[in-house]
Amino acid sequence: DPYGLGDSDLHFRVLDIPNFGNAVTSYYYNTIGGYSAVKMQRYQDLIDRYISSEIRQVFKATENAATVQEVAAALPELKVVSMLNGRYIILDGNISPVLNPNAYGNCWFVDSYIPAATPDEEIALLAHTDLRNTAVIGDDFAWAQDAIRHFENSSDCHFELVEKSPTIALTHYAPNELRYSFSTDTERAAIFSEIYYPKGWKAWIEPEGAYGEVRNGHYHPSGEGRPIELFRADWMLRGAMIPSGEGQLIMRFEPDSYQLGENISRASSIALILLLLGSAAGMILTGRREGKNA
């Protein structure tokens, strides 16, 4: 921890402006930026269209600031950096990182959505949408739009029955597994500051206090757990419909290719064992026959 952030949160990101294009800071923190030879095109589009612009806004707003406190006071609202949970901003390696008070956190509930008919419209809508309360969802996830629309219609009629604010929070973080606890009186849409990647990430809802088993690297829900679908929101983030009640959401990276490899490996092992057993049985029978003929 070269900057001594001392942050007890399970997961947040750092925007290191001087080292934005390399992996120096990524060794210590989760970062916005960094170098990757396999960077997703949608992420690169987000950098080109929004994050680069927000970095320029930071420089312009803080160019006359002489102290960390003045930098913090002058910091503009950074919508895309905030939705990516960019909690700290490094302007200069010689001064302390600046806290971004507007960071959305690891996850949040939204009350509504705006549909996007095309990818161009989807990324453009980020500039004009209150992303803290409204999600931008492409028409390729019409089922998620329908689910949120149903919630909107229900809340309009029964808002007075909602007695407490819904909550959702990250409780466990690992590169291949995330767990969130939630409490809500009605079904709601949650957005997560994680990259949507359909080829491997799977999700389950578990009742409060329940957790399935991880066997051979794969998550097996408890008897009461049920799988749910994830959707893409705000150009590249994950979204999920959270049912009413209390419980936990588990996301785990389990690509089908891994499962296929496991099955092939298991089948090969069984075949090898059967072959060895068959060979051993053959040797025993041959030995008995030779003994009788002796």
Task: Enumerate the language-model features and the residues they cover.
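Active-site-proximal, structured, solvent-exposed surfaces of multi-pass membrane proteins
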Residues: 75, 81, 135-294
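Extended recognition/assembly regions associated with phosphoester-bond processing machinery
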Residues: 59, 68, 86, 93-94
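Residues that flank catalytic or metal-binding motifs in active/ligand-binding sites
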Residues: 10, 85, 94, 176, ...
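Extracytoplasmic/lumenal acceptor-recognition loop(s) of multi-pass membrane glycoenzymes
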Residues: 1-81, 99-153, 198, 208-211, ...
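Conserved hydrophobic/aromatic beta-strand scaffold that supports enzyme active sites
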Residues: 95-97, 239
